[in-house]
Every structure is written in C-alpha cells, then in structure tokens.
Amino acid sequence: LIAAVARGGAIGRGNDLPWHLPEDLKHFRASTQGTPVIMGRRTWDSLPPRFRPLPGRTNIVVTRDPAWQAEGALRAGSLEEARAAAGDAPRAFVIGGGELYRAALPLADELRLTELDLDVPDADVFFPDWRAAGFEEVTRERRHAAAPNHFDFDFVTYTRSARGT
C-alpha cells in the first residue's frame, strides 16, 4: 500500500487530495514506476485525464460495474481479481481509495506512507488504522514541504513484523 496521510488518517476530500505536494508526487512516481498499481474506480476518476492511465505502470481498476472500461486500464471486480491481474509481478501497490485500502491492509506486507503534519478537518476519506496491524517502522525521512506549503512531512516505510502475521 502507498498513501499520503494527514493527521487523523485523512487521505481525501471531495474525491481529491486535500493538498498539493510535489515532493510526494515525485516519491509516488519513483516508488510505483514499473509496478502494477491497483485502485478503486473513484481514485481512477480523480486522476487528471492527462495522467490516465498512470504511465509506466499496469493500471488495474477495481469496480463493481461489469461494463466499466477505460483505455489503458484493466478492470477487476474485486481485490482478488486485481491481484490476479497483476500476474507474476514481484509487487503491486494499492494506491487508493479508502475502501480498497481497508480491504488490502490485512494482505499487505509493506506500507509506504507520506505522513503529513497537516490537519484536514473536512476530510471525507480516511486511511484505515494500521498501527495495531503488526507493522514496524523500517525507514523514516523527515522533510519540509516547499512553498507555498507550510508543513513538515515524513516518507515512512513500514513492514509487517513476524509478530504481526
């Protein structure tokens, strides 16, 4: 799983990110390049059209709509179908949204989170509470957001511990 998460687990507002953080977009691209990305249909819809599909990645969209199709994307009816569509790839990233993160968390070996020191009081989509799910922090890189942003953030990688399995 890969996500940018503000305080309180906020990840979305009105089918969009409640922040614009170029540093995180670069981190996301570098982390996911060349790997399948699995997303819900609303996450797909939230991508700017010029970035659909996300280049250099197999885009797999999970939707209950059997008629849904989009150029450059594979349709999956469930997370299990999406994992099968990823084929033999050594890893695939779930990139949102909240419902898919909740379904995928018990299956995840790794979380790559951008933890934002930012409050989003009107957020309407949240990352699931993963802290009791058996993950241990393995790396943390502290950063300060470039102007016009005025908050700090961390790139953090967590892996599932042997105790958490």
Locate each region found by the language model.
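Flexible, gly/pro- and Lys/Arg-enriched active-site loops
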Residues: 3-36, 41-162
